[in-house]
Structures are given as C-alpha cells and as structure tokens.
C-alpha cells in the first residue's frame, strides 16, 4: 500500500449506489477522514455530537502507516456510547482533525434507522448482521406501549422485503429511487 492510497472500510450490509471515486478524492483533500454519521441516540439529541460510524470509513493509507489510526479503530472508549469505533473520535480530537460526515439522505423512510442512503452514495441496510431492534424502536415502544418483540418482528418482515428488492438485479434501481423520493411505489 502507498501512503496516498485510499482505504475504504464498509459494513457487510452496505454498498455503493453511485460512483464515489471523485467524491472521495475531493473530500479527502480537505478532511483526513470521511465516515457515515452515527444516528442520534435516545440519550443524546445534540445534533452537534457527530460520531463517525464504521459502516463507511474512508481515509488515506498514511494514517495507518504513520499516524497510528489502526490502534484507534479498535479502541473501545468508555463514555455514554461505549462503542468499539469510539477510538476514532479520540484520534480525530488528539490531532485537531474534523471528519466529513455522510448523512442520511432518504426522502422516503421505511424506518428511522434501517434502509438508509447516505449522501446518495451508499446504501446501508443496518439490519443485515444484528438483532432487529433499534434505539428508535425502544423509544417507539416506550411512547406507544407496543411490545418490543412485536416491533422486532415487524422490522424483520420489512427487512426481508427490502432485502429481496435490493438483492434483485431487476428491482434494486427502483428501490433506491423510491428511497431517494424519485419513484412512486404502485
């Protein structure tokens, strides 16, 4: 690997939906790190608390070769989030860096967290490799009195339907257009 090579980390249930080479080249001229923005937590509604999420992280190889980023990528920080990727926050702060946050750009939201498009570049299913209950679902259950297990079952059913569409060569474009607000479901 060369120092100026771009390293891209991508979750197993995320994939590009548009060319992103030029976008990353441009952003990495200004920012040392490009990442999806962590969705807000129920205990932290501060929109200025931007947490890089590992479903998508891009940076130049020099940060691994000479700047110790590898150690920070696997560091669990003990704060209100206790996440294993929290070390990136420390890495950014210690160096005075800011990152470019990819933000959710869906126009149609089937769920407040799942089935997300970020900056019209990346699709993230969010439910591909974990339990089907989320922070927004727990808030919903608390506010409505619904059973969390019923919400998880509903999430699983919708996830299966969406996954079938995004894994279909004939339907993926329609699904992405729908989530972007460019296509009406019939």
Mark where each language-model region is.
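Histidine (H) residue identity feature
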Residues: 41, 53, 63, 111, ...
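Short, well-ordered beta-to-alpha junction loops that form the rim of enzyme active sites
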Residues: 11-12, 19, 103-105
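Short beta-strand-to-loop acidic/aromatic patch adjacent to the donor-nucleotide binding site
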Residues: 4-15
């Amino acid at each position: 690997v060369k120092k100026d090579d771009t390293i891209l980390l991508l979750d197993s249930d995320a994939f590009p939906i548009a060319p992103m080479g030029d976008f990353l080249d441009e952003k990495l001229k200004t920012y040392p790190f490009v990442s999806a923005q962590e969705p807000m937590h129920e205990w932290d509604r501060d929109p200025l608390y931007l947490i890089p999420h590992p479903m998508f992280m891009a940076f130049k190889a020099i940060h691994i070769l000479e700047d110790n980023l590898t150690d920070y990528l696997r560091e669990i920080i003990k704060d209100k989030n206790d996440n294993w990727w929290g070390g990136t926050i420390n890495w950014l702060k210690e160096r005075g860096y800011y990152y470019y946050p990819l933000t959710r750009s869906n126009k149609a939201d089937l769920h407040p967290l799942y089935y997300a498009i970020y900056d019209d570049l990346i699709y993230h299913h969010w439910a591909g490799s974990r339990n089907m209950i989320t922070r927004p679902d727990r808030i919903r259950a608390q506010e409505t009195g619904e059973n969390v297990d019923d919400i998880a079952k509903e999430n699983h059913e919708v996830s299966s339907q969406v996954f079938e569409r995004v894994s279909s060569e004939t339907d993926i474009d329609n699904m992405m257009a729908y989530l972007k607000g460019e296509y009406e479901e019939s």
